[in-house]
Regions:
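The catalytic Nudix box helix
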Residues: 35, 52-89
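Short, well-ordered strand-loop elements centered on a beta-strand within folded domains, enriched
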Residues: 1-3, 29-37, 121-125
Length: 172
């Protein structure tokens, strides 16, 4: 493949790979996911709740390397490879205008699950990327994210990968 900038990939809709990390926990018998509220300065979906952590896979990197890097950069979580569980991939494809510019996204997202204790008060948020974080009930987000695009920009394909992974783990 060729090396292109993030800006060019989204200006021209060039296919690329991303790493998505979903932080989960069980509370009172229900699965919760940690969502990040995107910074108001983001070039897409500013101020919306999104995947726990995500980012482009850099040239020469493997998806797992990028996932570990994004967790550290965005949330200050120093994870080791054994703590990230590969759950699958899904495509993202859309074009939408933000801040007066077209944003075209054509990506394959590699999904990882992080199911370790997380104290949100101790996270070190990358303020250019992340405004805040909040725990949500997984099923509630699945129900609401399509109807409430004013609040959530969570990719539904990612939620499906997470749910399938959890179903598989439950029956294993």
């Amino acid at each position: 493949g060729q090396i292109i900038s993030r800006e060019k990939a989204h200006a021209e809709g060039i296919p690329h790979r991303t790493a998505h990390i979903w932080i989960i926990r069980e509370k009172e018998g229900r699965v919760q996911i940690l969502l990040q509220k995107r910074s108001q300065n983001k070039d897409s979906f500013p101020g919306k709740f999104d995947t726990s952590s995500a980012g482009h896979i850099q040239a020469g990197d493997e998806p797992l390397e990028s996932a570990l890097r994004e967790l550290k950069e965005e949330l200050g979580i120093s994870a080791v490879p054994e703590q990230l569980h590969f759950a699958g991939t899904f495509p993202i494809s859309f074009a939408k205008e933000f801040h007066g510019k077209m944003f075209r996204d054509e990506e394959i997202a590699f999904v990882y699950i992080f199911n370790e204790p997380v104290n949100t008060d101790e996270l070190i948020l990358q303020t250019e990327e992340v405004e805040s974080v909040q725990w949500f009930d997984l099923e509630e987000v699945c129900e609401k994210c399509e109807k409430h695009r004013d609040i959530f920009c969570v990719p539904t394909g990612g939620l499906e990968v997470v749910r399938k992974y959890l179903d598989k783990v439950k029956t294993a």
